[in-house]
Each structure stands twice: as C-alpha cells, then as structure tokens.
C-alpha cells in the first residue's frame, strides 16, 4: 500500500513528507537555517509542540528560543529539569516540597523544604545532575490523563498544590509531562527533550537559590546574576502576606472561595487593609523627613500608579502635609520637537520627549519658595499652554509627581537628592498556579490593562495584546533599570484580583477571532483564567487599586 504523503509549505517553499512524520523530524531538516534552536511550530497558524505528527497538507512556521514564546518554553523546560534534578539528588523521602516562587533578575527564585541543608555543595550537585540529563538528551514525553487520575497521581506524589488545583478544572483531561519515570504538570508548551536545555546556572540566594536562564535576545548566553534586593524583599513580604492567610496558590484561593467557612468579603478587606497600612507607612516615612519635597512615583504599565498616588496623598494629609499633584506629561516638548520612533511616530516614552530643563527650572523655583505658573500640555494641539495655573510651596506643601522617568535622576538632575523621595510601584503577583508553575507579573498587568482599556478607551483586547510587546520594551528601557534606585517599593497586586478580573477579561478575550495573530495569546490567557473560581466585584472597596481597572471607584481618574 502506497504511503500517504502531505504537502508542507515552509519558508516559502513546498516539500512533501509521509503521514505520521513528526514536526520535530521536519524541524531537524531546517534547523541549520535558523540561528537558534527550534522549539515549537505554528501549523496553519495554530501553535503546536514538535512531538505532534503530520496529518494533512499544511503551512509551517517554526518558533525558536530567540522569540518570547520560545524563550518561555525553554524556561518551562529548565524548571522541569530542575525539579527532577532536586528529587534525583536528594530522594523523595527527604523532600517535603520544591517550590518555584517568582522571577528575580533573569531567573526564578526557588526553595526546597525538607530534611536537608541547602548549601553550595548541594546546589552544585543539583546543577551537575541537570547537566547530566541535558547531555543525555532524554525525551520529554506527554500523555493525557483524566483529571480525576491527575488528582490521585499528585496526591500520591505529595504535590498538594497540584492536587488542589485540578479539583477545580472543568476540562476532563490534563496533559502530564515525564522525563523517564518522573511525572509533573506544566502550564504551557514544552521542549521535546532535555538536550535543548543547555544554558542555566544556579546561585544561592537568601533562603533558597535562583536558577538563572538566558533571555530571548541572547538565548545562548546566561546573564550574570545581579541581585535585586529591594524588589526581592517586596516580593518576599507579599508572599508572607499570602502565607499568613494560607493562600499561596490558585488552588488554595479556590478552596478559600468555595469552602464552607469561606468569606470572600473578609479576604478582600484584609488584603485592602494590608495595602492601606503599607501606604500609611510610606506617608509616615515621608512626613518624618521634612527635607523631602518631591515624591516621585514610577512603575510599569497598569501598576495602579494613579490610584496609588491619590491614596498616598490622602495619607500624607493625615500625616499633616499638603500634597499637590504634578503631571510630568505637562512638560512634553511641543509635538514638532518630539523625537520620532522607528515607525516615524512621535515617541512620547523617551526622556528626550520631555523638556527636562524647564521641568528642573520650575521645580527648583518651587523649592526656593517662589510662585510659578505651571504648564498644561494640550494633546489635541500638540503644544504646551499656560492657563493661569500658579503654585507656591509652603512649609507643609509637598509635590506628588507621577511619570515613566521619575526614578531616573536624569529627569531631576538639578534637584538635590535630599529633597527627593522615590517610589517604585508594580503589580508583583504573589500567587502561584502551583508548586512548579509561577504566574508572570506581566500576565496580571496585561489582564488589568485589557479590562481598563476596553472599558475606558474602547480599545479591544486584540489591540491591547498587539501593542503589549512595544509597551514591554519601553518598560525595559525606561523603568526597570532604575527600580532598585527607589527609596520604597510598593506592590499593588492583590491576592484575589485575578478571580475578580476573570469575569471582565473572559468576554473580551473570547471576542478575538481564530484567524487573528493575537488569538494564541488570547487562548493562553483564557486557559490561565480558567484555573480561577470567580469572585464577584461587589465587595471590592471603591478606593481599591483594582477599581482603576474594573471601574466604579471613588477617584476621578
């Protein structure tokens, strides 16, 4: 019987392959054309793992580790390799839990609970075991099991967080990955084998360690580990807040929401009270130093900067100060003088788009007690205007300034350091999906932004997803390099928020058509939100940072 052949379009050329050929085999024939390892493939626009088999005529587009989704797949593989190496090195009997917590620098912070002493010698053994498995190029197999079987499997393995998670899955089956006999669950796509996982380095850090990995820009280079101690402290502090409530993972949150003694309202109010306490402490710290006249607030997109600045201003008043907001946007250069980006559009995100000298001139005069007229930028005309907005600072007056570049000293180069108080704010998700699957803070911020932009700007989820990578690049250039220069960091993420945002985000994500380039990302986010049992928004306080995104807040934003 003649073997069935299928026509495959790749890189503008057509080639025939027998039915049942894996995409991994096809990728092998084309790998030398690509500068980085091929790890995934789009089949007629649908993202697939390389282990899948050819079943019909199709067009293929390969994905490498040099792309964002390929890099995430690589990191997922390293995480799996790491967890197996820990169990191989120590044995199951000595381990209570291996946990991958959150992102630190270019890697993940991890801890091991159990009968062990984590030191450099043990870490070296774990890393050596990881390299051994990578050198052997062991297959990473995938099998689909019934959800009930997965629950029982992870109960047997002592992976309690996964057991809890799957009790709330509405799908009937779950994909399980294995290296030899070691099985685990990972949210997202996986590399075909351990041979792809060549680049990683383990560093002792705090009570655990960091597994450092390459980024998409340089997928064969392990960046040196640069501790971010302030950011790490905030993340750890936020995680302790979840631990105090017994909520570390999505499964634990779902248990809390659905349990017989559950009171979601109490959870919301406790979380909000914890944030208010932190804001009050920041205000007291500022008020305790009379030299501080400029409160400079910066953070990435959808961090809740506006609501935070309003709530901080209220607490500053409680502390006896009189806060005045100033928008850095009012110091944009006239549009004719605005630098252009690569597409020839005005680039309002770069520092050069601002009249930095005028900004410093005005703030220095205010610091000296002089009365000045502040500008207002008219976005319709593209020009600065003066509309009679005068200001003069008294002894108790203080400026609250919010803007992308507020942590960058180049923005306030003429202002004395002793007069500045810098605050970095971000939504640093403290919740994990389970022990081995972290939630990227960028996902939380993207969902926040989609919900807000759909509600306030008429921007579709498709448009928000399409522009997100550009937003991220701006953050990488203008915000993240300066975050450790902040005097204080504030985490605006709330343990419960994704369970509330779910009801707002799902309808707009379902509106993205399958033939859109943004469909794969929408599909991924929908799968992610499906892990959560929803919480109604009726108990979210009107001054909550979350109200900046879902609406019905008390601030005029």
Region spans (language model):
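Hydrophobic positions on the alpha1 helix immediately C-terminal to the Walker A/P-loop
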Residues: 308, 312
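Short beta-strand-centered segment that lines the nucleotide-binding/catalytic pocket of NTP-utilizing
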Residues: 318-336
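Hydrophobic anchor at the beta1->P-loop junction of P-loop NTPases
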Residues: 295-297
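Conserved lysine of the Walker
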Residues: 305
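Glycine-rich phosphate-binding loop used to anchor ATP phosphates in small-molecule kinases
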Residues: 360-418, 468-482
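Conserved nucleotide-sensing/catalytic segment adjacent to the nucleotide-binding pocket
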Residues: 333, 337-379
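Auxiliary tRNA-acceptor-end handling modules of aminoacyl-tRNA synthetases
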Residues: 52-73, 85, 89, 94-104, ...
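Conserved NTP phosphate-binding and transfer environment spanning the P-loop NTPase/kinase superfamily
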Residues: 290, 412-557
